[in-house]
Amino acid sequence: MKCEPSEFSIDDLERAGEYFWDGVRNYQVRNMFRDQMRVGDKAIFYHSSTKDVGAVGEMEIIKQATPDPTQFDSKSKYFDAKSTTANPRWLGPTVSFVKKFNHLVSLEEIKNDSTFSDLALIKRGNRLSVIELSKKQYERLIKLGK
């Protein structure tokens, strides 16, 4: 799961302990939250749009996707006038901090590792904030981050 550290970082998650993953406004990602992520699933925290881009830690899904409250807040940059409490358009899971990697696994490192040759993250034009990993890819990131 990708996030800009200027918005929310692995350090912020570590301090908070848990966090509702808000502000995602992409239907494909919303559907992943709703249909694929389950309590107990693990996820990689990935810092994007920063000097040091890469995988920085691990988190766990502790609550399945629920309506994102920012979609109803007219003062929020994530407000969606077409969304209603009866028919919310946007969802997000609640995650908890598991660990911070000792070593940032850079995008360059990921690109140069054959384990990730089919990973959407390294494909041209991919802008999704959530990318599915195979078990092998997940385990490799954990190993590289040690």
How should these model regions be labeled?
Residues 12-13, 71, 106-108, 141-144:
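A short secondary-structure junction signal
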